[in-house]
């Protein structure tokens, strides 16, 4: 069990409200410049996040538990042992609707094909981002959503 004196507070917030809020010993995520992990007494930081998975290692009764959250970009701010992730959208693994994510993936693939045929770079980029978001949600749900 973690030292109760070395705990950080982790919150994930979207425009719809708080998606996640727990005490933890570590939070790990993919920033746009690479993977990061933050623990107790880390220096203050603000950094943009890539589309990816956030892992929160928290204490749960007598053993550690890792929560997984699919995040579609945003940023993390850490200071005074509080980590706040602000994202356009985020979902805990257990809450991801697989059918919705699969539909989003299929739509993104169709949009990519249409953009390719029209030689529209902007639409192609938008479709690629939508595809990465859908694939991220599916990955997090399929691997950690039990």
Swiss-Prot record:
It is found in: Cell membrane. PANTHER family: ATP SYNTHASE DELTA/EPSILON CHAIN, ATP SYNTHASE EPSILON CHAIN, CHLOROPLASTIC. Keywords: ATP synthesis, Cell membrane, CF(1), Hydrogen ion transport, Ion transport, Membrane, Transport. The keyword Thylakoid does not apply. Produces ATP from ADP in the presence of a proton gradient across the membrane. It is a peripheral membrane protein. Residues 103-122 are annotated as: Disordered. Its main location: membrane. This is ATP synthase epsilon chain. Transmembrane segments: none annotated. The keyword Ion transport applies. SUPFAM superfamilies: Epsilon subunit of F1F0-ATP synthase C-terminal domain (SSF46604), Epsilon subunit of F1F0-ATP synthase N-terminal domain (SSF51344). InterPro entries: ATP_F1_dsu/esu_C_sf (IPR036794), ATP_synth_F1_dsu/esu (IPR001469), ATP_synth_F1_dsu/esu_N (IPR020546), ATP_synth_F1_esu_C (IPR020547), ATPsynth_dsu/esu_N (IPR036771). F-type ATPases have 2 components, CF(1) - the catalytic core - and CF(0) - the membrane proton channel. CF(1) has five subunits: alpha(3), beta(3), gamma(1), delta(1), epsilon(1). CF(0) has three main subunits: a, b and c. GO terms for molecular function: ATP binding; proton-transporting ATP synthase activity, rotational mechanism. NCBIfam families: ATP_synt_epsi, PRK00571.1-3. GO terms for cellular component: plasma membrane; proton-transporting ATP synthase complex. It holds the Pfam family ATP-synt_DE_N. Belongs to the ATPase epsilon chain family. It comes from the Bacteria.
């Amino acid at each position: 069990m973690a030292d109760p004196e070395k705990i950080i507070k982790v919150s994930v917030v979207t425009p719809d409200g708080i998606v996640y809020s727990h005490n933890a010993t570590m939070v790990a995520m993919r920033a746009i410049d690479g993977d990061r992990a933050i623990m107790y007494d880390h220096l203050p930081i603000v950094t943009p996040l890539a589309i990816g998975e956030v892992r929160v290692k928290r204490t749960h009764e007598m053993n550690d538990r890792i929560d997984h959250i699919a995040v579609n970009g945003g940023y993390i701010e850490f200071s005074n042992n509080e980590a706040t992730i602000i994202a356009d959208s985020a979902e805990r693994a257990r809450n991801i609707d697989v059918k919705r994510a699969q539909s989003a993936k299929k739509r993104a693939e169709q949009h990519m094909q249409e953009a390719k045929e029209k030689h529209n770079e902007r639409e192609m980029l938008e479709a690629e981002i939508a595809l990465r978001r859908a694939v991220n949600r599916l990955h997090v749900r399929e691997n950690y959503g039990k």
